[in-house]
Amino acid sequence: MNSVLILKTMISTTTVENVATYLKKEQSKTVAICNSNTLVRSYRDSVIQNKINSFDIKAPDGFPVAKSSKILYQNDQNRVDGFKVFHKTIENGINDGMTHYFYGSNSKVINLMIQNLQLLYPKIKIAGFFCPPVKSYHELSEEKYVKDLIDKNADVVWVSLGFPKQEEFIYELKDKYQITSNLVGIGAVFEWVAETKIKAPEWVANIGFEWIFRLIQEPKRLFRRYLIDNFLFIIYFIKQYLSK
């Protein structure tokens, strides 16, 4: 899959459909759903940068990332929304018996999400789920916290631990164990599917204001990510653009 350099991250040039098809056909692959926060943290932290760049797909989830790809490389890149990747992957795999495992979040969110998924996709095959305790990504990669995930051997493992913890967990998991499942860091998607949080309307996301919608819902947690990191993203992008 082709990719382009944005800040210091190699972002895949792809679509929602292509990522979903990739997850259906491949094994033992890793996918990071990247927004401006991902790229800023990777720019400032070489350890995170190297881990993210090792993923097989780095999908441009955020509007700023997709727009930057268009401006820098004159391509037709659109947002690869993690929420849409999640649903499209499930839809594409229904008739082939594709199996899914959910790792992260909490029991309330997971149970509500599974209820909603079973209503939307009555034939969905859920291999299992695990809601881990609050531990570091390194501790969570210990066998007692991943044994069920490994034993169930689902086609896709969806990981919702928040960035960068979920990506660091996936990296550690691949490094320590022989895993044939595809591993996808999916952020807040579990909560959106469970409807414990409200996802921004499509038109809001398409004009680049999804971050405002989310900031209003969680100002304390997301203040730094959206107000500081978004500003830094613009600065770093301008620097890259002027250096062309």
Specify the residue positions occupied by each region the protein language model found:
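Conserved beta-alpha
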Residues: 70-148, 152
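Short gly/pro/ser/thr-enriched loop/turn and capping motifs at secondary-structure boundaries
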Residues: 65-67, 165, 189-193
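Proline-aspartate-enriched helix->loop->beta-strand connector
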Residues: 149, 153-163
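N-terminal nucleotide/polyanion-binding subdomain common to many enzyme families
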Residues: 1-84
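Short glycine-rich anion-binding loops that position phosphate/pyrophosphate groups of nucleotides
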Residues: 35-39, 161-166, 189
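Short, flexible loop segments at boundaries between secondary-structure elements
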Residues: 132-137, 179-217
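Short Gly/Thr/Asp-enriched flexible loops that form oxyanion-binding sites at enzyme active sites
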Residues: 114, 167-176
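A transmembrane-helix-recognition feature enriched in membrane-embedded lipid enzymes
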Residues: 64-70, 199-244
